[in-house]
A protein has these predicted regions:
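Structural detector for internal amphipathic alpha-helices that build alpha-solenoid repeat scaffolds
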Residues: 1-2, 12, 16, 22-35, ...
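HEAT/HEAT-like alpha-solenoid repeats
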Residues: 6, 111-114
Length: 199
């Protein structure tokens, strides 16, 4: 409760600082970064009402809090109705590197989360994503997200993963098959040629 009150005070004071590069403003920023992850929802709310300069500062504070334990706090930011808040949350998650990006794939299960915003973050961190995890979620998401996940897969897939994808061609979902064929077509191999011929 006390940290929440302190956070509100600091945010209010920071909003009144015209020069966000001043020593006083920077001191407030550092204090907000040290208050702990419970301030994340308040920082997300602050973005909704802030100008461009202050938004940059709040995104920087948010990015400093991103880790595997705090990730669920950011779900709220991606679910917000305000474009500024969603964009700020995307920016923070895209800037941060101190977390397992594959955990974000679970956000597809949340109807409130903006899927285009989530896809933006995943694209930024695509080289850290697991093809196995992308596939697992591709079976569960809507057509547009499915296409997005397979586009990422196409970018990051390596040849050693080909046999697993070939095995999945025997599945019942026709849309998955079409996407798998597009991914596999990237490689010029006889076994792939044979599978594509058989479809």
């Amino acid at each position: 409760l006390l940290s929440g009150f302190r956070a509100d005070q600091l945010i209010s004071s920071l909003n009144n600082q015209r020069d966000i590069d001043s020593a006083a403003a920077q001191k407030m920023v550092e204090r907000l970064k040290n208050l702990g992850p419970k301030v994340i929802p308040r920082i997300i709310d602050a973005i909704a009402m802030s100008d461009k300069k202050h938004t940059v500062v709040y995104v920087d504070i948010l990015a400093s809090y991103v880790n595997d334990k705090t990730l669920n706090f950011f779900r709220e930011g991606l679910s917000d109705g305000g474009e500024r808040v969603v964009s700020g949350t995307v920016w923070a998650l895209s800037s941060a590197t101190n977390y397992n990006v594959n955990s974000l794939l679970d956000f597809f299960d949340d109807d409130e989360v903006s899927k285009p915003a989530l896809m933006k973050v995943l694209k930024v961190h695509q080289n850290e994503l697991s093809v196995h995890e992308l596939l697992r979620h591709a079976y569960k998401v809507h057509a547009q997200e499915k296409a997005g996940l397979f586009n990422i897969m196409q970018e990051i897939i390596t040849e050693d993963m080909v046999p697993d994808l070939i095995n999945r061609m025997g599945g019942k979902d026709p849309s998955i098959k079409v996407h798998l064929m597009q991914v596999l077509a990237k490689f010029k191999r006889q076994d792939i040629h044979q599978v594509l011929e058989d479809q």
